[in-house]
Amino acid sequence: MQKINNINNNKQMLTRKEDLLTVLKQISALKYVSNLYEFLLATEKIVQTSELDTQFQEFLTTTIIASEQNLVENYKQKYNQPNFSQLTIKQVIDDSIILLGNKQNYVQQIGTTTIGFYVEYENINLSRQTLYSSNFRNLLNIFGEEDFKYFLIDFLVFTKVEQNGYLQVAGVCLNQYFSVQVKQKKWYKNNFNMNGKATSNNNQNNANLSNEKKQENQYIYPEIQRSQIFYCNHMGREPGVFKSSFFNYSEIKKGFQFKVIQEKLQGRQFINSDKIKPDHPQTIIKKTLLKEYQSKNFSCQEERDLFLEFTEKIVQNFHNINFNYLLKKFCKLPENYQSLKSQVKQIVQSENKANQQSCENLFNSLYDTEISYKQITNFLRQIIQNCVPNQLLGKKNFKVFLEKLYEFVQMKRFENQKVLDYICFMDVFDVEWFVDLKNQKFTQKRKYISDKRKILGDLIVFIINKIVIPVLRYNFYITEKHKEGSQIFYYRKPIWKLVSKLTIVKLEEENLEKVEEKLIPEDSFQKYPQGKLRIIPKKGSFRPIMTFLRKDKQKNIKLNLNQILMDSQLVFRNLKDMLGQKIGYSVFDNKQISEKFAQFIEKWKNKGRPQLYYVTLDIKKCYDSIDQMKLLNFFNQSDLIQDTYFINKYLLFQRNKRPLLQIQQTNNLNSAMEIEEEKINKKPFKMDNINFPYYFNLKERQIAYSLYDDDDQILQKGFKEIQSDDRPFIVINQDKPRCITKDIIHNHLKHISQYNVISFNKVKFRQKRGIPQGLNISGVLCSFYFGKLEEEYTQFLKNAEQVNGSINLLMRLTDDYLFISDSQQNALNLIVQLQNCANNNGFMFNDQKITTNFQFPQEDYNLEHFKISVQNECQWIGKSIDMNTLEIKSIQKQTQQEINQTINVAISIKNLKSQLKNKLRSLFLNQLIDYFNPNINSFEGLCRQLYHHSKATVMKFYPFMTKLFQIDLKKSKQYSVQYGKENTNENFLKDILYYTVEDVCKILCYLQFEDEINSNIKEIFKNLYSWIMWDIIVSYLKKKKQFKGYLNKLLQKIRKSRFFYLKEGCKSLQLILSQQKYQLNKKELEAIEFIDLNNLIQDIKTLIPKISAKSNQQNTN
């Protein structure tokens, strides 16, 4: 463990001291790397440095050039005494572009191009602006015209823009080194060999076998299109499938061919079109199937013919299925269906508004008619058995497929099955119609299995995509429910038709009105695609969801509405930093919340920690409460938005944390080599293959900037993460900027607020008030609107701070307000002022979500209609704030069942170890990263919360562990996890846990407590978290009956090796327990069934002398 810590410390030390010049010298592709000053001395372009001014000399020493060849001698032979250029710098640059030809260069030509709504400006480019500077003009005079032209072509030129940041202004694009994005393991395999020796002839068969494994692993199986089953409103008169489905494809194709033939033969009277017949339906099926399902996977013509015979049987069997009978048998309508139908009809035909209570009861009755997973599975199994011959997959494989259907039906919204989830449980030798392979070598048999698995994957996808999914889409409406997470529910289409009719009535009564397309302005109608409305069942009502992801093919609009608003979103992203400082009190993320909260804590401590009062409020339906005309007026009058913006894409090449190998060797520090050898099983490293992906990470981002922004402001807007990092980085400005004006954004907002049309069941609606919630600019617009409103009504807070010296903190995250102050009167005045703001601007506060920590007479302030809740602990947006210490902790109210319904387990058997490791790390960081702030919470407070964060992490990780233990390793040896010499889930889970904890602690300690935390506290944190995490994992798995036999053996091993994660850090653990910085109470131990803290402490005390003696003996040896 100490060895790993030393490696990490050396790694951090090296990355902090290095600069870009040192890093580029390690790139094997660059044969020459130097600063510009040394290059000019080597080429004898300059001799006396005293003639150069200080600013230009600094420019030469900080500018780095690099090339794939050493061209110093070439530049010595030309223009030893160059004449001063008579051309402008712009003309020389344009000439260099002509010389460059087809090569990629960052110097752009001048011109404008109109694209859609926008205009591209090729001459406004950060790299080009830098080349137009006086420094490059002086450089042109030193080189001469011809040399300077070739200099821009031959060299990569990086100019310094920040302390450790550079801008590439010329040369070939660095992005070419990242053109092939390969995974790290694959990159290592290409750059390391076994002891530096070539493969011998004796091992040729093994080499062929490994190549076949690579081909099999690299093969991409077709996808199961499960996402298509959701939200299909289409309903036919009779149960079955769509007319455009595979089974009706031959009839459609037949009619289409007759139509084409008639059009071609129009005017040719000498040909009788009645005698011309289209292809036979079986011929059409053959043509389409062989194109769609990769006929190249079939090994011979015999297999192709057999496959087509099976499909013809499937089509014939499908047309003979009685869907009415199967639906009545497995998924019948409720007995009171006719009664529900008559009630809905009565409400729809009624001219008066429907009774609220009767509508709620009717909605609940309709929602209660959902079909269970078991009923749906039995219905699908019966169709597959009647339609598909079991010989197509093999009898045993067919049984496996039917069993897997239940998993397909009950999966959550964003989960999907992989073809490998079926294949790894199937046997290709069970398929009798495959051409058999007898008396062949092992390598040929393996290739046979690999090829047949590909065919088996095509067959599985064919059955699911062409039979299962169309049947579900046509006969059922599949959706989520409100407050049910990602769990899905099935409804019969006749039931959902009643729900839709009742929904249209309620929509007209609320914030939507029917609209005709004739009333929409032609400009807005032609340019913007329409959105789509769907509903999610909610108790007694529904929740409308507007989506803007579809494109309008009829109007030839190739972009959806969110894509059209992408540039406007970039402009509004700049407002996030200004809102809350110049207008209102908006916050957008946990980073802004933490910064404001930390500033308030510092003021509170400086004032002597006075008593605090808080208020939380919630705006009711904030998006629907926005006044559309006021929003447009606020936008036009605001000086925060400039008249013109340029949209450009920047690339960031940021130095990663991998150490420089050459520096490690010269300083006799082998830590970097140790890290690399551990990752590649001690295979020697090829120094000649180090390239940019080894030392740099690539990021890209689009930003919006105005003409008044300087270079530093542009970089800060695009890459905020580089401000807090001291590693070297390179910024590249490659694209041609495009322009967007304030008038264009105004037209977008006008369409959104006044002419935005959405469709529901072929009925067009328009919002009476407010803006849609599903757009990419809705959140910023909402915060901007309410920020302008609250600015007028909160002026008294600024006056109170100046007059009384009170300290106040007011934040609003979209619609949730939080106010903390040392003055109770300020809190009361805020409630009154915000209520006045709501009354004057047509919105309301949710009267059941107002909380304070003090009581007051509501009648005196005209607030008697509010149901104010008094709580000593402030709870706001999932955070709990202790008003005595102002420490923040998370609120975990979800049960394990609710979490299981929310978490989507979208992982495959392939690369399972890395997927689970990354998932566990992200889950824990999401739980703790926002609270690991030394300016807000103390380390002792974090230790007290550690158990709760660990428990919440494991509860969310539990569905993934269930997926792990469901894998049948006996039937799936190829996809089992290799851990040393054993294939066990126990060691696999230990491996995931150990390295995840290592990464998490390194990230947290390095980023937040770098200056004040020491190695002992880091060890305490890591070992304590490991101990709690592992025990909770086992306790949860122990409760599952299907793992009982396995876990009994596992628990025995764990009890014997209880101190697996404590041996190296038990001294630190005993220290923290003796100082009482962290203790588990009885409530915290309820979830851990077999742990006794007192016994554990005694065990640690008895174990320490043994470990100490053993370690001393090892040191002596």
From Swiss-Prot:
Name of the protein described by the UniProt record: Telomerase reverse transcriptase
Known outcome of mutating R812A: Abolished reverse transcriptase activity
EC number(s) given by UniProt: 2.7.7.49
Binding site for Mg(2+): D618, D815, D816
Chain residue ranges for the region called TEN: 1-191
Chain spans, region TRAP: 638-742
Annotated ranges, domain Reverse transcriptase: 517-881
SMART domains in the record: Telomerase_RBD
Family in the record: Belongs to the reverse transcriptase family. Telomerase subfamily.
Functional description taken from the UniProt entry: Catalytic component of telomerase, an essential ribonucleoprotein enzyme that copies new telomeric repeats onto chromosome ends by repetitively synthesizing the short telomere-repeat sequence 5'-TTGGGG-3' using an RNA template component TER. TERT is a reverse transcriptase that adds simple sequence repeats to chromosome ends by copying a template sequence within the RNA component of the enzyme.
Outcome after substituting E480D: Does not affect reverse transcriptase activity
Phenotype for K532R: Does not affect reverse transcriptase activity
Reported impact of N884D: Abolished reverse transcriptase activity
Keyword Transmembrane helix: no
Effect of K493A: Does not affect reverse transcriptase activity
Highest taxon of source: Eukaryota
Result after altering K538A: Does not affect reverse transcriptase activity
Region described as RBD: spans on this chain: 217-519
EC class (word): transferase
Catalytic activity as recorded in UniProt: DNA(n) + a 2'-deoxyribonucleoside 5'-triphosphate = DNA(n+1) + diphosphate
Effect on the protein upon substituting Q767E: Decreased reverse transcriptase activity
Residue numbers spanned by region RT: 520-887
